[in-house]
């Protein structure tokens, strides 16, 4: 593993959340969610640089102080999350090396402890394979038939909730 880059898709409108302000710009603890997210990534000495994929018509990005950090660059994002991730990967393809890795982390997920990020990176280094953060499913899950009636309880023993960041070889 050579360098680790981060791609932060941030072009979304947050339709599911609703409201006038996209969720990455909603404030908690005095700063937009994306500001907290970028600070968490910038805190890691393992991350060489960050590409933030923004909506080309975004007028709120000026509120994100971390975008001015020399390790952060922006690129136009797309209509969907996958489009924004691809835009970030395409930019990195021109700068990254064959041995580089990329970490994808959502702009509106600010609660990323440095310890979790470091453990994720160490696991990738040891295994040489892509890794994700995940946690066991704790909620009871029900299976429902076509008639809308509960037909059973799902065994959660092997079920995990995928989270971000997700870390993979850049040129995989």
Predicted regions: what they are:
Residues 28, 75, 162:
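Hydrophobic residues at beta-strand termini and immediately following loops
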Residues 106:
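Substrate/cofactor-recognition hotspot
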Residues 1-57:
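N-terminal glycine-rich phosphate-binding loop and ensuing alpha1 helix
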Residues 33-99:
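Conserved N-terminal catalytic core of the sugar/cofactor nucleotidyltransferase
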Residues 102-103:
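Short aromatic/hydrophobic "clamp" motif used to bind/position activated sugar donors
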Residues 111-172:
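Conserved core of the sugar-phosphate nucleotidyltransferase
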């Amino acid at each position: 593993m050579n360098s680790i880059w981060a791609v932060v898709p941030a072009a979304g409108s947050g339709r599911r959340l609703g409201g006038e302000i996209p969720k990455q710009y909603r404030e908690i603890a005095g700063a937009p969610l994306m500001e907290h997210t970028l600070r968490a990534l910038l805190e890691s000495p393992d991350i060489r640089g960050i590409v933030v994929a923004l909506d080309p018509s975004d007028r709120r990005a000026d509120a994100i102080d971390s975008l001015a950090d020399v390790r952060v660059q922006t690129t136009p994002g797309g209509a969907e999350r996958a489009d924004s991730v691809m835009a970030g990967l395409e930019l990195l393809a021109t700068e990254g090396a064959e041995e580089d890795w990329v970490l994808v982390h959502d702009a509106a997920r600010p609660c990323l402890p440095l310890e979790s990020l470091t453990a994720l990176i160490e696991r990738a280094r040891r295994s040489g394979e892509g890794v994700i953060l995940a946690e066991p499913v704790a909620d009871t899950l029900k299976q429902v038939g076509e008639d809308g009636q509960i037909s059973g309880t799902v065994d959660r023993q092997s079920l995990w909730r995928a989270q971000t960041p997700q870390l993979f070889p850049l040129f995989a």
